[in-house]
Swiss-Prot record:
It is found in: Nucleus; Nucleus, Nucleolus. SUPFAM superfamilies: tRNA-intron endonuclease catalytic domain-like. GO terms for cellular component: cytoplasm; nucleolus; tRNA-intron endonuclease complex. Belongs to the tRNA-intron endonuclease family. It catalyses: pretRNA = a 3'-half-tRNA molecule with a 5'-OH end + a 5'-half-tRNA molecule with a 2',3'-cyclic phosphate end + an intron with a 2',3'-cyclic phosphate and a 5'-hydroxyl terminus. GO terms for molecular function: lyase activity; nucleic acid binding; tRNA-intron endonuclease activity. GO terms for biological process: mRNA processing; tRNA processing; tRNA splicing, via endonucleolytic cleavage and ligation; tRNA-type intron splice site recognition and cleavage. Constitutes one of the two catalytic subunit of the tRNA-splicing endonuclease complex, a complex responsible for identification and cleavage of the splice sites in pre-tRNA. It cleaves pre-tRNA at the 5'- and 3'-splice sites to release the intron. The products are an intron and two tRNA half-molecules bearing 2',3'-cyclic phosphate and 5'-OH termini. There are no conserved sequences at the splice sites, but the intron is invariably located at the same site in the gene, placing the splice sites an invariant distance from the constant structural features of the tRNA body. Pfam families: tRNA_int_endo, tRNA_int_endo_N. This is tRNA-splicing endonuclease subunit Sen2. It comes from Rattus norvegicus (Rat). InterPro entries: tRNA_endonuc-like_dom_sf, tRNA_intron_Endo_cat-like_sf, tRNA_intron_Endonuc_cat-like, tRNA_intron_Endonuc_N, tRNA_splic, tRNA_splic_SEN2.
Length: 463
């Protein structure tokens, strides 16, 4: 057997973030107050483990790159803001999403359909949506006697706005009276997007998928005839509030958005037959149909955080699950969980960041530091065998299929690794009912490389 040649991980050309920490736990050299050990909260919903706390999501993904956003490719950073509109209105210093009028109307229709399914009549639905989607002032809120602060735009931003086309007038509608205000009052802060404690809201999530579609109803709507807050809260049990409350976070309040709308106005001093000029403005409204993004953990990632690090508590129907129950539940959901987790635990303990290798036909992909910094170095196939290398294979290979998989891995600059988990011949299925069985497991790694005759001849000639 030839000796394996280890290649250095290939760093990505462009890196857009800094490396924080390999794991979401404090290390011995960290003595600052902010480095306290923290228990994160997750829920098991529809055979999936999801994290809903905003700070928990940031910590778990930012430190160790655990999980992925259910609406994003990797980091949970989903936003409904239109990138083209955000670039067009770049002079508006605001953290509120900017969307088109058509996109906002889609959300109004989704909210309308949701309330119809709850049994509301058409007049009640129309009344609720009319009141909820009225134009508002940008959400400056008084906090403990503080007056709202309006920070003007910088001169640089003003000059950039003046250079726009003459037919596009930048304005913002404020107040229910239809008044118009200039853009100098749109510099909002992140804490201005939630109303004060005096505004009660109901958040209802759709059970159809993990994408939390929510409709919010202000307290004033309870005074509308034939409509009560309980009507919008009939499905609260489908998405229990326990996770956000356990995590120490309150329910998200209203989400404010800026909608680009068009106005028609006659040009001053123009002839009657001159065409109308279209002016565009930004209108602040409440989003009637919110979409929440959560962090979804693989079963291996969730169990590693709970068992190996002890920093994750997983709840099912508001009840915390023990380590043994998690081991049994994950095995019932995914029959190959024991095998894949042992390999995941092994590679994580060695400093690699394992991710699902389904894209390249393997079980795991191994990254150095994390996907934002390096390309995956290895594609891993996992097999559980006894000490005689016998047993039922999870994935039997023929020479043809193995050569094809090796060719695929080589074409994407990854090495194919066979990871053999060797258990004693005396170990029974009953012995594997708890994670303590991992103490008796040995691991052997085999790197598979393709022999190329022409390359071998050139190497021999050089020698």
């Amino acid at each position: 057997m030839a000796e394996a040649v280890f290649r250095a991980p290939k760093r990505k050309r462009r890196v857009y973030e800094s490396y924080e920490s390999p794991l979401p736990i404090p290390f011995s050299q960290d003595q600052s107050p902010r480095k306290e050990f923290r228990i994160f909260q997750a829920e098991m919903i529809s055979n999936n483990v999801v994290v809903r706390g905003t700070e928990d999501m940031e910590q778990l993904y930012g430190k160790g790159y655990f999980g992925k956003g259910i609406l994003s490719r990797s980091r949970p950073n989903f936003t409904i803001s239109n990138p083209k509109l955000a670039a067009r209105w770049k002079g508006v210093q605001t953290d509120m999403p900017i969307i088109t009028s058509e996109k906002y109307q889609h959300r109004v229709e989704w909210a309308r359909d949701f309330m119809r399914r709850q049994g509301h009549d058409e007049s009640t639905v129309q009344k609720i949506l009319t009141d909820y989607t009225e134009p508002l002032e940008p959400p400056y809120r008084e906090r403990k006697g503080e007056s709202p602060q309006h920070e003007p735009l910088s001169s640089k931003a003003d000059s950039s706005l003046e250079g726009r086309e003459g037919k596009d007038e930048l304005s913002v509608t404020t107040g229910g009276a239809g008044q118009s205000d200039d853009l100098q009052g749109l510099n909002t802060h992140s804490d201005c997007r939630q109303e004060g404690p005096g505004h009660a809201t109901l958040t209802v999530a759709s059970p159809s998928s993990l994408n939390g579609h929510a409709i919010e109803d202000p307290e004033a709507l309870s005074q509308i005839p034939c409509c009560s807050q309980e009507a919008l809260g009939q499905q609260d049990d489908l998405w229990p509030e326990a996770s956000s409350q356990i995590a120490g976070e309150s329910r998200a309040a209203h989400e404010y958005v800026l909608i680009e709308e068009e106005l028609c106005d006659v040009q001053e001093g123009a002839a009657p037959h001159d065409e109308l000029l279209k002016r565009k403005r930004l209108v602040c409204r409440r989003n009637p149909y919110r979409i929440f993004e959560y962090l979804q953990l693989s079963l291996e990632e969730a169990f590693f955080l709970a068992y190996a690090l002890g920093c994750l508590s997983i709840y099912y129907e508001k009840e915390p699950l023990t380590i043994v129950k998690l081991w049994q539940a994950f095995t019932a959901v995914q029959p190959t969980f024991r095998t894949t987790y042992m390999a995941y635990h092994y590679f994580r303990s060695k400093g690699w960041v394992p991710k699902v290798g389904l894209k390249y036909g393997t079980d795991l992909l191994l990254y150095r530091k994390g996907p934002p910094f390096y390309h995956a170095s290895y594609s891993v196939i996992i097999e559980l065998v006894d000490d005689n290398f016998e047993g039922s294979l999870r994935r039997p290979f023929s020479w043809k299929s193995l050569a094809a998989l090796s060719r695929v891995s080589g074409n994407v600059s990854k090495e194919l690794m066979l990871c053999y988990l060797i258990k004693p011949s005396t170990m029974t299925n009953e012995d594997m009912e708890t994670p303590e069985c991992m103490r008796r497991i040995q691991v052997q790694e085999v790197i598979l490389s393709r022999w190329v005759s022409s390359r071998e001849r050139s190497d021999q000639d050089e020698l």
